[in-house]
Amino acid sequence: VDIQLLFWFAPVGAVLALTFAYIFYSQMMASDSGSERSQEIAGYVREGAMSYLWQQYRIVAMFFVVAFAFFAFLAFVLKVQSPWTPIAFLTGGFFSGLSGYLGMKTATNASSRTTAAAAKSLNQGLTVAFRSGAVMGFVVVGLGLLDISIWWKILNYVMSIKDSLKDSWMSIFVVHDYIEITTIMLTFGMGASSQALFARVGGGIFTKAADVGADLVGKTEAGIPEDDPRNPAVIADNVGDNVGDVAGMGADLYESYCGSILATAALGASAFGIGQYANLQLNAILLPMAISGVGIFASLIGVYFVKTHEDATQKDLLGSLGWGINVSAVLTGIAAGVLTYIMLPGHFNVFGSILAGLISGIIIGWATEYYTASDYEPTQEVAGQSTTGPATVIIAGMANGMMSTGIPVVTVGVAVLFAYGFAGGFENSAMGLYGIGIGAVGMLATLGITLATDAYGPIADNAGGNAEMCHMNPEVRKRTDALDSLGNTTAATGKGYAIGSAALTAMALLGAYVEELRVGLIRMANTSGELIDKFIFVEKKPVPVQFATMHDFMTFYDVNLMNPQVLVGVFLGSMLVFVFCAMTMKAVGRAAHSMVEEVRRQFKEIPGLLKGEAGAKADYASCVAISTQGAQKEMITPSLMAIIVPILVGLFLGPSGIMGLLIGGLSTGFTVAVMMANAGGSWDNAKKYVESGQFGGKGSDCHKATVVGDTVGDPFKDTSGPSLNILIKLMSMVAVVVAGLTVSYSPKVQYVLGFNPTEHRYKEEANLAVKDGTLKLPDPKTAGIASSAMGMQDEDDPLMGSDDTILAEDEEGLLGDDLATDTVQQEPAAAPAPATPAPATPAPAATPAPAATPAPAPADSGFGGFDEPAKPAAPAPAAEPAAPAAAPAPAAAPEPKPAEGAATASPAADGFGDL
């Protein structure tokens, strides 16, 4: 099978997704739009939503202009990253913003039509709402996969004509191999991440400022029901549902979807880049794209399985959505198995990694539903605490949220282990990281239908509000309530799914970051022209950057828990999560305060408004404006913090500090996000459980207590919690994009600060040794292929990239004591060795006894801490090369390269190991 043909699953699937998104949109627009009053209310919501979106995009556009200039400076002036990066950054943000706009336009047009359809039957209401949500789902996957496909074809074409571009002004845009292509493509994920964070934070602040203001004054103080047209904040509340849960959720999952595919492609290019599996490199890159393409086909089939019957219960409705999702998941799993078998022959176990991702997504969704739906015990217990007041409701909800972290965290942990293990990670770390990435792709492959269930929620919620404000008959309201209740559960499930996918994607990005370090070091070496910059120094030997393994980089940058730079990074990452949450929650509080004051003012100053007298009309626009202004102003600081902190940590603490930052942010952010989303969901549904008639029903003291809990939970589940998904991914994306800046300038910054990191000391001492002639570096294009290929692929040495072990007396050498290698001594000694048997004694390979004599020489050079001659163990391996040296007669023939032969024959006999 021609692998390039299988790539076309991606662009064809993308075009098909966009085609069906247009079909579903057209079908929705052709349906009955409802009464004149219903259309009027929907018009208010649509106008407010679009007004907010355009104002947000203006602010985001200004940020993108500044960021573009910054990346252009890094690319064209400092030359620390690819010139393609600024352009890729813009396209990622543009497509993310476009998907949000199209999803919002669909959702705001669908609410009145869902209400009208629900007046006919429950099934028709479900169909209109769900297929309108499917527009968002398929727009996200279609635009995401189309963007990836276009970039892949462009960069492949540039690589194919690189020779003709070398002497032209376009030479700076030349790409040389698949590793460079995939790392360039990965950087457009930062554009998507940045847009997603602004959408999530801004949308979350908007919706919850309106929601909290409407609830505190409307329900708690005035005692009027939810979605009552007398409440001036009710339209802003409905606008917020679309801004936060349609545009925000869509941008969030667009980022995860693209990030997982691109990170996996980059990891595949690395894992299959050299060694015996190098012929599968292209296959490994294209596999995540092909799986995502067939996932679109499967999602389209699943959409047509979502239908229900009249008098359906909540579980029946959940079952109908679950049926569609499960059909899509099964079809995707089968197709992924076939693709893996075809594209990765001999590596079918990678299919197990895909299944690990798929299954973990289902388990996380189920766990979220269990802890947040009112049909289950945890949320009912929260509602039961309302009999003793709001304080115990808040305590119970917090406890429920904390308890709910168990299953998702364990599930993701097990999924990571299985995905890593199935791909062969315990024998080969690069393959294991590829398995984690492909697991994230498996979880997100059915995003078309899973995002449809998420976007369905706010559409159904708006339809219920529309029916309430239009005073439609109780039967219609009953149906819209059923759809709304289903939407609350799917929204909570979707948040859990988004958090789980964010965790797996961030894990894959951690691995991809190391590949960006490699590319950054290569670019730095090409810019400086210094031979020494083409090596990193790992355990007694220089290793060419292009052949270095994951473990080589971790050792070179001293990434271990005893390194204070790593520990400080971990603490900063954990702290950043809580500071970010605090900033977003305080932002909601400030904006909600303004909203409460405005609603109170209108109740006092507009005659007859609170009593519902004819002619008394609330000023909805002023409340929308307050939420909009509050969201625009408050979203900037936390968003910029998430972008600036990784850049500063990279410069001041280096790659080891960045790894700590990302690990701390991921572990803390994932757990806190689950806790906040599920605590907020349980408070919300506890209130709805009481409103259904339990514990006194609406208007009772228990109801008021649960309203307080729901109000506290609003920023938990719709602002801070969901924004953490993007925070942990955006930090990784920023680190990936500025990796070139980090590797080029962090050693200098740290040296000025007096940190003198290990990698800087290694390179400085090696540089001195090269200049004074005591160290001769090997050819970086060929040296190290054996050891590094073995480190990447060989079962005998899967991680280390070196056969050498560190003796106790050499531990100090690893900390920068010395860096010399035997090769330096062997090459000058090669000429006298064959002359006569007598002078051969000083040569290290001649006999064990005289070998100790020249040992002080490298130490005097200042670059000798890695000398093998100084080791007591050195004479033992020296005996093996002595056998060929014992025949002096033929020694004249191979005279020009005795040292090279010795180094290759016995890695342990010299400082270069396999080199």
Residue ranges of each PLM-predicted region?
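Hydrophobic packing and interface segments
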Residues: 1-787
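Long, low-complexity intrinsically disordered repeat regions
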Residues: 774, 779-915
